[in-house]
A protein has these predicted regions:
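Cytochrome P450
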Residues: 1-406
Length: 406
């Protein structure tokens, strides 16, 4: 690879189908590499663990593009209100706004609330596996990995039963649209507006008639007299749904594929199900559902990792590459469900660490053991080379995972 080849093409087949050899070659050459095929003009991609970890904590970089003299596509004046609301979320905020939003949301989205979902989540897992067991061949993505987190977050948010099928269809369609770039997203405006109206109506209803659910808790969250605005609540709901949903879907889907491709690790987990927490951390590292972080924008002309970076330049923290960095992990290309320590970056680091991490870990720790115990003889129904991958936004996941359960 000469200097002319030092770039990462988001639209290349290699990046979609198996990016890890490409990451390894880039890591060996440079900590920052230009990106092609992204809506972010002039974007760079951090390839190494140290570079990504420093990027996510360096105060010289902003999450809000406006603080670096740049702009964010989702917040453009011509964007529909839906996307402006979605883009103006906690993830794209800096201090003090980020701290204000996180403090308020953390009063509603608590570890206790997540733990209280365990029994309901177990029931949903068993119901979905019962349905899968009736089939001779099953697509794990559409039958289990996709509906599970949607069903759990629906229960957690208190979405009425009568609205759940419509909500599930709308969310699945919206998340799938990110694979089609900006055109795919814009085609989802009518669907997105329907979801927006559903959420706004639900927020209004919970404001008038609070219940024991996440929406009611967000409405009631207060700190020193401060409350979330209506737009803050809608953007937070979308953030929880989109970010949390895709992470869990692909932890389950790609994680199951990784186990099937490493039968000795699968057998070890079946023999020692109590090791599931450690296993989930390794599956997060090894599969890295999120390819990269939200962009960080240089607040000024600066030097980072030996590279000159001009003000306003967006840098993507390449967590999928960082999680396979030879300088951060021993034998990083090996799946080791007993790996400790395991300081992966799959859920971020620093003040923007994923708030939904406890829920993603709970869902994964219930779904994967139940799946492998229920179907001890499950196997791929097609050769692994025939599996197709999707790239909705910064996520890499399977289009389908055809399995023979027995």
């Amino acid at each position: 690879m000469d200097s002319a080849d030092l770039f990462l093409d988001f639209k290349s087949p290699a990046f979609r189908n198996d990016p890890y050899p490409l990451y390894a070659r880039l890591r060996a050459r440079t900590a920052l590499v230009p990106v092609r095929g992204s809506y972010l003009r002039g974007a760079l991609f951090a390839t190494r663990y140290q570079a990504v970890a420093e990027l996510l904590k360096d105060p010289r970089f902003a999450n809000d593009a406006h603080h670096a003299g740049a702009s964010h596509a989702m917040g453009a004046w011509w964007m529909p209100r839906l996307f402006q609301t979605m883009g103006n979320n906690m993830l794209n905020s800096d201090e003090p706004r980020h701290k204000r939003l996180r403090n308020l949301v953390s009063r509603a989205f608590t570890p206790v609330r997540v733990r209280e979902m365990r029994r309901a989540a177990e029931v949903i897992v068993e119901r979905l596996l019962d349905d899968a067991a009736r089939r001779g061949e099953v697509d794990l993505m559409s039958a289990f990995a996709l509906p599970l987190p949607l069903a759990i977050i629906s229960e957690m948010m208190g979405i009425p039963e009568a609205d759940r099928a419509r909500f599930h269809r709308g969310m699945t369609s919206l998340t799938n649209s990110f694979s089609g770039g900006i055109v795919g997203v814009l085609m989802q405006i009518p669907n997105g507006n329907r979801l927006l109206r559903l959420f706004e109506a639900l927020i209004d209803k919970r404001r008038a008639e609070p219940r024991d659910d996440l929406i009611s808790a967000l409405v009631q969250a207060e700190e020193d007299g401060d409350r979330l605005s209506a737009d803050d609540m809608v953007s937070m709901v979308f953030l929880l749904l989109l970010a949390g949903h895709e992470t869990t879907v692909n932890l389950i889907g790609t994680g199951t594929l990784a186990l099937l491709q490493h039968p000795e690790q699968l057998a070890a987990l079946r023999a020692r199900p109590e090791g599931i927490q450690c296993a989930i951390e390794e599956l997060l590292r090894f599969t890295s559902p999120a390819i990269f972080t939200a962009p960080r924008y240089a607040r000024e002309d600066l030097e980072f990792q030996g590279h000159k970076v001009t003000r306003g330049t967006p840098i993507l923290g390449g967590v999928a590459s960082a999680n396979r960095d030879e300088k951060a992990f021993t034998d990083p290309e090996r799946l080791d469900l007993a790996r400790e320590p395991n300081k992966h970056l799959a859920l971020g680091i620093g003040i923007h660490f994923c708030m939904g991490a406890p829920l993603a870990r709970l869902e994964g720790s219930l779904a994967i053991p139940a799946l492998i115990q229920r179907f001890p003889a499950m196997r791929l129904a097609v050769p692994a080379e025939q599996l197709q991958w999707r790239l909705p936004g910064n996520i890499r996941g399977l289009v389908a995972l055809p399995l023979r359960p027995t």
